[in-house]
Swiss-Prot record:
Family, similarity comment: Belongs to the phosphate acetyltransferase and butyryltransferase family.
Gene: pta
Pathway stated in the Swiss-Prot or TrEMBL entry: Metabolic intermediate biosynthesis; acetyl-CoA biosynthesis; acetyl-CoA from acetate: step 2/2
Gene Ontology biological process terms in this record: acetate biosynthetic process; acetyl-CoA biosynthetic process
NCBIfam families: PRK05632.1, PRK09653.1, pta
Protein name per the record: Phosphate acetyltransferase
Biological source species: Clostridium acetobutylicum (strain ATCC 824 / DSM 792 / JCM 1419 / IAM 19013 / LMG 5710 / NBRC 13948 / NRRL B-527 / VKM B-1787 / 2291 / W)
GO MF assignments: phosphate acetyltransferase activity
Amino acid sequence: MDLIESIWECAKQDKKRIILAEGEEKRNLIAADKIIKEGLAELVLVGDENKIKEKASELNLDISKAEIMDPETSLKTETYARDFYELRKHKGMTIEKSEKMVRDPLYFATMALKDGYVDGMVSGAVHTTGDLLRPGLQIIKTAPGVKIVSGFFVMIIPDCDYGEEGLLLFADCAVNPNPTSDELADIAITTAETARKLCNVEPKVAMLSFSTMGSAKGEMVDKVKNAVEITKKFRPDLAIDGELQLDAAIDSEVAALKAPSSNVAGNANVLVFPDLQTGNIGYKLVQRFAKAKAIGPICQGFAKPINDLSRGCSSEDIVNVVAITVVQAQRGI
């Protein structure tokens, strides 16, 4: 059983209620039909009820078991406006502005998550990552002990021996443009825990660079080296090393030459990139050239599960992210 099959089976065992903030969007509706048929989650769709039902009918989809919530007519909107005002009044929020903001589908969905009405939230087929993160950070905030929210991809690479038989986690590929050493350490620790709890693999974390163990010098290299030291200080139990070039991180023969004393080099299954440019480009290179399945971006670090989608996602991608969100809710990831 591969990872996706395992996640699906786990999701079915203890279904959670997931809210799709972009309920009127075609790919979300196709995904909703599949999710309901497979029994992966209980769904709430945000949007105009008539539009959603009309589109579903046109596409010959059965979403009758999904709840539809329209922020313009929902009985919860007034409560959410009042609660959001209380959360943000110290930042200058007014009740009038709050009433307007919670009618935005993303803010409405995030308040439903805060309220406990749903267990997880998925968005991003239409909206940007920033659109999703803003209400998430304002309303849900980060989990205890976590400094920043970050995003990772589960990469499943066919006919590949690297990582866990072709399975690797890439971070941060979605959120933080230029993380500091402290932030990189936080990303490494959070992604390692995610690898263990979500993917059931023992994490071996490589902090990537264009340098391996001092082969190059400079501020960019120092940032990664410092992140490794910070991580080891707070989590000496984690298998983590760096700075490592990609080939040294995943190829045992290269590792034997470049980093022979490393306990991670050649066997890494979690790759932490030094910044968002390298992370985002890196996952897309592997996805396109190696025909890899890229599942994500999955957000980590929120107090409750909130997940992003690529605007280029397929309905299948949405199904998988919803299943992962269910498992995150089950396991408190």
